[in-house]
């Protein structure tokens, strides 16, 4: 992400979705010595069909200091494992980093994509942190638009810490609705980041989805049905998963398995 109640049950967006398998035990890749260490501001690694980025784009707002290193821990079959250690101080309400793994794919119109199956297993050892764990996807009418912004942003938060909030135009901070998609319950927030419309799906307060498997295309389908998202005009630019770090730490974010696919 850039610097920034009606209950609806969609049975049509449920169990029939294409998803990827998950395992019930942590994979060994994230426990071993890292394959690569990424510790500079935009340290980057492309491997196994994924890009790993130590994306410290908000480091200048860390007035109290801090640092972050991200580690590629290896391939787990068709998936990847990565982790990140960080500590940040100063400006509690600004994002210091969004480290992530991004699936490499050929850009296509969202409407031409049949499914976006994904699965992830993650954990967080936290010390007074303000952070989230989230998927982040940008779309734009221009297939060659940079992947750092878009006309639309879809965020799927799996957890949040320290009372942080998504972008919202609600004066009370309330979600616009509660909805069930892909078998999970979400609270939907929406607002603007400059000229970009942002849709953020969050678990209900007190809920954490540490093991998540779903078809992300179902979220776009829902936005098209309910909020007129123009899938036939918008190219998907990026498809990633990671953590936005605000302040706190020392913290250790561990992704033992992340897999994402683009099926057309």
UniProtKB/Swiss-Prot annotation:
UniProt catalytic activity: Endohydrolysis of (1->4)-beta-D-glucosidic linkages in cellulose, lichenin and cereal beta-D-glucans
InterPro entries: ConA-like_dom_sf, GH11/12, GH12
Note: The biological conversion of cellulose to glucose generally requires three types of hydrolytic enzymes: (1) Endoglucanases which cut internal beta-1,4-glucosidic bonds; (2) Exocellobiohydrolases that cut the disaccharide cellobiose from the non-reducing end of the cellulose polymer chain; (3) Beta-1,4-glucosidases which hydrolyze the cellobiose and other short cello-oligosaccharides to glucose.
Family in the record: Belongs to the glycosyl hydrolase 12 (cellulase H) family.
Function: Endoglucanase that functions in part to hydrolyze 1,3-1,4-beta-glucan during infection and spore formation. Shows preferential hydrolysis of barley beta-glucan and lichenan, but also hydrolyzes carboxymethylcellulose (CMC) to a slight extent.
pH dependence: Optimum pH is 6.0-7.5.
Organism: Pyricularia oryzae (strain 70-15 / ATCC MYA-4617 / FGSC 8958) (Rice blast fungus)
Protein name (database record): Endoglucanase cel12B
Location in the cell: Secreted
Spans through the membrane: none
Main location: secreted
Keywords per UniProt: Carbohydrate metabolism, Cellulose degradation, Glycoprotein, Glycosidase, Hydrolase, Polysaccharide degradation, Secreted, Signal
UniProt xrefs under Gene3D superfamilies: 2.60.120.180
Molecular functions per Gene Ontology: cellulase activity
UniProt-annotated glycosylation sites, renumbered to this chain: 125, 147
Induction summary: Expression invreases increased 4-5 days after inoculation, but is not detected during spore formation.
Enzyme Commission numbers on file: 3.2.1.4
Signal peptide (residue range): 1-17
Pfam families: Glyco_hydro_12
